[in-house]
Amino acid sequence: MPRPTVEELRLTSFKSYRRAVLPLAPLTVLHGPAGVGKSNALDALAVLSRLALGEEIAGSLDGLPERTGPLAGPVRGGLAGCVPHGRDAIILGCTVRSPHGLIRLDAVIRTDGPVRIARESLTLDGRTLMDTGEQDVRNRRVNVCWHNDTRQGDIRAPFPSGTMITAQLPLRVAGSSAGECLVLAASEDLLTALREVFPLHPVPALMRGWARADPQARLRSNAANISAVVARLSNECQRRYGQLLRAVQAVAPHPLLGLALAERETAGVQRVLAVFDEGVLGRTGADQASDGMLRHLAFAAVLLTGAGVLDLDVATEVPWAHRQLTVLAEDLGAGLSVEQAAALLRLAREMAERSQLRVVAALQEPAAAREALAGASGGGAVLVECRRDPDSGFTVLRPQVPRVPVQGGRGEAAGAGAGGRSAGGGSSAGTRAVPAGGSSAVGGAVPAGGAAGAGGAVLAGGAAGAGGAGGAAGRDAVDLEG
């Protein structure tokens, strides 16, 4: 059974984005200089993931210090930082591919007055399963209508507007009819896909400290407790520990014999520190290691271990085989050479091809991605250029096709090139900005069904499936932007 996965992110009004669409493949790499908005796209998916946990919107985005887990700290910039300058609304959406079909979520969050859901809709293959109506701003309620295929028709009821409506459906819909069961199945698939999102932005300054030993240590988003996680892996799974060691050895600029641990006791608390064993050169602890090696260690650990050792609030009621982890790798190439960053991306591609996880990575220079993704086919990877429109200042996304190395002689290559242009209706090297309508074109039209064309078109992940990105819900959302 296919696992629910996010295949498209719609950034209608969020930070530096206006009416932008990001197609998501098993491995998606965004590149561009600092300040163009790569991190903003990762933040958008992180925001949807937080809202899917069912907590109040303001607390979900500003952080809940009394909590542990992904909501303990704020999303970058907090709630106020997510609202575009001069606006009073966040408008986001996504499309999830599930065993039941393409599920489309669109949400408008207003921040003028009480933070609230102003509009939210959920559709499955174009059929509306849930939609919102009139608001009672003073009492923070919104009328919700959901699908029901009995004689009494669709059901309406007021819901609290301070929380994502879709996250409330499993607690409010009885499931007493086939229609309601479909609503529950679609909402649970969407929530499962969003809750399995893990933002990873390693901070080397925090990773150098001694970590409290914990046999159940879960890596935090800043990787501050990486030493405790390495200790857990060394005791729990020698196979993964060995894979992690080989991944680190592959990029080390000097012979590396092992990945060890130093231990000490402070005030009755056992603490550990990851150590790079360099043989005759000595042992370098995490407190002395370079920023790049520490960041590489954190990224490799996440790619090789999966959700079981991450600080996630996963849908434990859903069997592991029906869940799919998505890693948001922030600034993946920082402190690494092109070859080292390419090695990480090759590892990410390998794990994505095995359906172990999905990765959305951001880096500045595309050289490492082009090297790692050379020969990628079948829609397994998408390279997306991020830039700022010089007139509006908004971020523009330009998906690109990973280039496949030419096989055979020049004559064969020329013939293949001519054939590709004829079949695709244009040069396969061309790129265009992704329009708000949800379909992108790279050397030709992109199929909405999510299958790669023979000409190598970028996958749109079924963007136009559930009513199209320019549907009524999207238009109403823009009208509510204010």
Can you describe what each PLM-predicted range is?
Residues 242, 249-253, 257-321, 331-339:
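Conserved ABC ATPase signature
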Residues 342-438, 460-462, 467-482:
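C-terminal lobe/lid and adjacent interdomain/linker elements of RecA-like ASCE P-loop ATPase modules
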Residues 26-69, 223-224, 291-306, 347:
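Phosphate-binding glycine-rich loops of NTP-binding sites
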Residues 9, 325-328:
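Hydrophobic positions in the central parallel beta-sheet of the AAA+
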Residues 104-242, 246:
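Electropositive, glycine-dotted interaction segments
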Residues 19-25, 319-321:
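Phosphate-binding P-loop
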Residues 1-16:
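N-terminal pre-Walker A segment at the start of P-loop NTPase domains
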Residues 43-114:
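Conserved P-loop NTP-binding catalytic core
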